[in-house]
Amino acid sequence: MNNVLDLKLKKIDKIYRPGSKVSGNVVINSKDDMSHSGVTIVVEGTVQLQLSSKSVGLFEAFYNSLKPITLMHYTISVTNGGGKFQAGITELPFEFTLEPLPNQQLYDTYHGVFVNIQYSIKCDVKRGILSKDLSKTIEFIVEVPSQNKEVLMKSTPESLITFNITPDSLVNFKKISKADVPTFKISGGLVSAICNINEAFQGHMIIESADTVIKSVELQLVRVETCGCADGYAREVTEIQNIQIADGDIWRNFKIPLYMVFPRLFTCISTAGKTFKIEFEVNLVIMLEDGHLITENFPIKLIR
């Protein structure tokens, strides 16, 4: 059996908030006595930005603003210098406070396409010249509470949204000639455009009338990632998930519930930094049998 290095956090879900204590153990499992030159832990939080292939080369001014942003970085010495671990399992405790670097702030953990916010703990066990160093890295999750005023906004009547979709209300219809557009009327409502990320997106829709057969109804969650600076920016919209709400020709005047859970890691609270921004939108997509596609867009704000 080779020497095995592992990192174990005391919280099983590995979810922490700014200012909280992060504690755990460095676990070393060795077959024989093992000499070392020291055990260190490096805690790091970074924002990684990148441009899409269509934007590369168009925005030379972006490259300086696209450098990784270090939110937190500190090194912890787990042992006082070198020594020897006895054969078997050795556990070394560690603890640190989750705090950002000066003039920085912590953001939600987020795995996007052009923006990534990650927090990691890396442990290194230094050994002699003739022995191989041991290294182990794990990721932990940071959840940042929203400001109180944002939470209060969620319960105000102004946050309720009603909508009516007709051929005249559509901005971008999939066919140029409106004479070819079938007659339809779709109404509904959303509980709120300000959504708690730990709760489901909810609402309803009603097909009041439609001259053509409806094929299906889908609810699409998209991310809107913006990277750049004052000299210019690149805005990229990509799909996170697509949920089918109804299949086939729906009864007219039947109330259809809209319900969607926000996936962890692939969503975060709506976030804005100096050189990046993360926003979210929901698309209600109605596919007609004749090939038309009706889409209504709802920008939403995610809070915690």
Curated annotation (Swiss-Prot):
Claim: Mitochondrion is one of the keywords in the record: no
Swiss-Prot/TrEMBL keywords: Endosome
Compartmental location: Endosome
Superkingdom: Eukaryota
GO cellular component: endosome
Record-linked SUPFAM superfamilies: E set domains
GO BP field: intracellular protein transport
Listed InterPro entries: Arrestin-like_C, Ig_E-set, Vps26-related
Pfam families in alphabetical order: Vps26
Main location: other
Similarity annotation: Belongs to the VPS26 family.
Subunit structure: Component of the commander complex that is essential for endosomal recycling of transmembrane cargos; the commander complex is composed of the CCC subcomplex and the retriever subcomplex. Component of the heterotrimeric retriever complex consisting of vps26c, vps29 and vps35l; within the complex interacts with vps35l. Interacts with snx17 (via C-terminus); the interaction is direct and associates snx17 with the retriever complex. Interacts with snx31; the interaction is direct.
Function of the molecule: Component of the commander complex that is essential for endosomal recycling of transmembrane cargos; the commander complex is composed of the CCC subcomplex and the retriever subcomplex. Component of the retriever complex, which is a heterotrimeric complex related to retromer cargo-selective complex (CSC) and essential for retromer-independent retrieval and recycling of numerous cargos such as integrin alpha-5/beta-1 (ITGA5:ITGB1). The recruitment of the retriever complex to the endosomal membrane involves CCC and WASH complexes.
Protein name (record): Vacuolar protein sorting-associated protein 26C
Source species of the chain: Dictyostelium discoideum (Social amoeba)
